[in-house]
């Protein structure tokens, strides 16, 4: 059993024109790079970021800064917002290129509903600050996946060599299994960049089974790639039978997969926090313990999301 440490709540800046929502309540993705934390929330139209020093993780409480990604305003009403939200669930760092020497961030919607089939690329400045963003329509890509995965729900992803790896999150419904999906990374990025001649095709689909708690399967909500090519997955057991309806979080855990996708370690998290994002706290890994950062989604707009820290053996 692992015991996460609370580092901070994810408050937004307060201004004279502040909206009623003063915090993130549905954090869904996390990247740590360029001395910053970058976050997305599944019911927001913005990227959020804040300076972060892994040497003093518990001493930082500056408000999050926002960078708009999608146009328009989402409804304040909880039910209407859930129907309209873009459901941005995957946040990953793309490698540097001559056109983007600091790399780019890529956000992906979960893909189930039409409103959730968009991606946003964000350029990063020399200091890591978010710059211009480009919105991509992923309808064709997700239509192809939906043909073979009925309850499509992409929750995380990463680049591993020449592969793009995406995580399909399962649920309690019969046949709704979690899976690791792989694609040709170069082809996907070319397609994303405008070469729409040929859709990226699914190369492999590996079923993921992490057991269950009280009859509820542990399913992946995010992933962080490690320097050795293995990855850490955040897992929750949410008592629901579809990808849209929320349910009670029965348990939470972290799992480590080797580069071949085989399970190496699985540890439950005390308190069953509904973790939706995971990232390495530092790239300078010493020994066998991984310092990880986690963000939570309480499925309640009145409850702020939190940033947690845990040592993963």
Describe the role of every protein-language-model region.
Residues 1-313:
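Sequence/structural signature of beta-propeller domains
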């Amino acid at each position: 059993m692992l015991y996460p440490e609370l580092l901070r709540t994810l408050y937004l800046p307060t201004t004279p024109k502040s909206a009623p929502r003063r915090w993130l309540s549905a954090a869904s993705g996390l990247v740590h790079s360029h001395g910053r934390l970058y976050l997305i929330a599944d019911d927001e139209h913005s990227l959020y970021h804040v300076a972060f020093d892994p040497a003093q993780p518990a001493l930082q409480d500056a408000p999050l800064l926002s960078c708009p990604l999608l146009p328009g305003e989402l409804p304040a009403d909880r039910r209407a917002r859930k129907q309209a939200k873009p459901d941005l669930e995957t946040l990953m760092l793309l490698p540097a290129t001559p056109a983007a020497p600091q790399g780019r961030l890529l956000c992906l919607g979960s893909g189930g509903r039409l409103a959730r089939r968009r991606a946003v690329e964000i350029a990063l400045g020399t200091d890591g600050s978010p710059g211009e963003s480009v919105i991509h329509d992923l309808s064709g890509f997700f239509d192809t996946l939906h043909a073979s995965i009925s309850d499509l729900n992409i929750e995380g992803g990463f680049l591993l060599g020449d592969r793009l790896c995406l995580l399909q999150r399962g649920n309690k419904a019969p046949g709704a299994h979690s899976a690791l999906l792989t694609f040709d990374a170069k082809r996907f990025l070319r397609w994303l960049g405008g070469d729409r001649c040929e859709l990226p095709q699914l190369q492999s689909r590996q079923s993921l089974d992490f057991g269950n708690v009280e009859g509820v399967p542990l399913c992946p909500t995010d992933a962080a790639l490690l320097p050795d090519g293995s990855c850490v997955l955040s897992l929750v057991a949410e008592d629901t039978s579809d990808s849209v309806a929320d349910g009670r979080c029965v348990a939470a855990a972290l799992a480590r997969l080797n580069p071949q996708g085989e399970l190496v370690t699985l540890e439950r998290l005390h308190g069953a926090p509904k973790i939706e994002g995971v990232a390495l706290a530092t790239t300078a890994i010493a020994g066998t313990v991984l310092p990880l950062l986690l963000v939570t989604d309480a499925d309640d707009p009145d409850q702020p999301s939190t940033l947690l820290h845990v040592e993963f053996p």
